[in-house]
Each structure stands twice: as structure tokens, then as C-alpha cells.
A protein has these predicted regions:
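Nucleotide-activated chemistry modules centered on ATP-dependent adenylation/adenylyltransferase
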Residues: 1-134
Length: 134
């Protein structure tokens, strides 16, 4: 059921970005929600299992410009992944950035683990993607 519904669901932060290229509403493929979606669906269903149409379908096809929206979020994830790899204990602190977790004190380690696993999913998705100013 989820696999069938995933193609008609919308995660993109700006699904009308493609209108300037004559495209309809669709996932851009490179914003934060699209990257998390792609990483999660690839983890769940394997490479090629995500039937979603993305404006930028292949993140590896060419270097992504970090001065443009296509490369900014990729580079941000690359920095975050490298930072967490160097200091894994940071996850326990970073989970508090969105807001208070005072009502979840007994679950902080589990929440930090969700954060780590989520970044690991994105890391697998963007492994080998080149993001730099062009």
C-alpha cells in the first residue's frame, strides 16, 4: 500500500520549481524533504525502487553547483555527515536544535539514534555526489 501511495504523495518544499522549465508540480529531488524522502525510499525498497519523478533525477550525473539550490542542501548534508562522523556524540546534542525534548527525557538515546540512522541513509544516497561552486 505504501509503495503505491508514495508516487502520489508530495514531500518537496517547492514543488513548482520546474514551472520555469515547462514542468508541472513534481519533486525537485534536491531540497531537504526530497533528499530525506529519496534516502528513506531507497533504504526501504532498494536502488531503483522509488518510482517518484524528480526534476533532478540523477544526483550523480554532473557536479551540483553549491551557489544554486541544486547543490546547497547536498553540500550541507555532506558537512553534517562529516561532522557527525568525526564526533558521533554530537547527535545527542543536535537532536535538541528543533526544540525542547523535556517531555522525552527517557527516549533521548533512541532519538539520537534515529538522527544518526537518518543521516546514514542520506549519506548512502549522496555518496559520490559532487557538490561545489561552479
Amino acid at each position: 500500500l505504501l509503495k503505491n501511495l508514495a508516487t502520489v504523495s508530495l514531500s518537496c518544499s517547492s514543488p513548482t520549481k520546474g514551472r520555469w522549465r515547462g514542468l508541472g508540480i513534481q519533486h525537485c529531488g534536491y531540497c531537504l524533504p526530497c533528499l530525506i524522502r529519496r534516502a528513506a525510499l531507497t533504504t526501504a525498497w532498494g536502488a531503483g525502487g522509488d518510482a517518484t519523478t524528480y526534476t533532478v533525477n540523477d544526483l550523480h550525473a554532473q557536479p551540483l553547483d553549491t551557489r544554486e539550490s541544486t547543490g546547497k542542501q547536498i553540500r550541507s548534508f555532506q558537512y553534517a555527515i562529516a561532522r557527525l562522523r568525526a564526533r558521533p556524540q554530537l547527535a545527542n546534542l543536535l537532536i535538541h536544535k528543533p526544540g525542547s525534548l523535556a517531555d522525552e527525557l527517557t527516549h533521548l538515546n533512541e532519538l539520537a539514534d534515529v538522527y544518526r540512522r537518518g543521516l546514514a541513509e542520506v549519506e548512502r544516497l549522496i555518496d559520490g555526489v559532487e557538490a561545489r561552486p561552479s
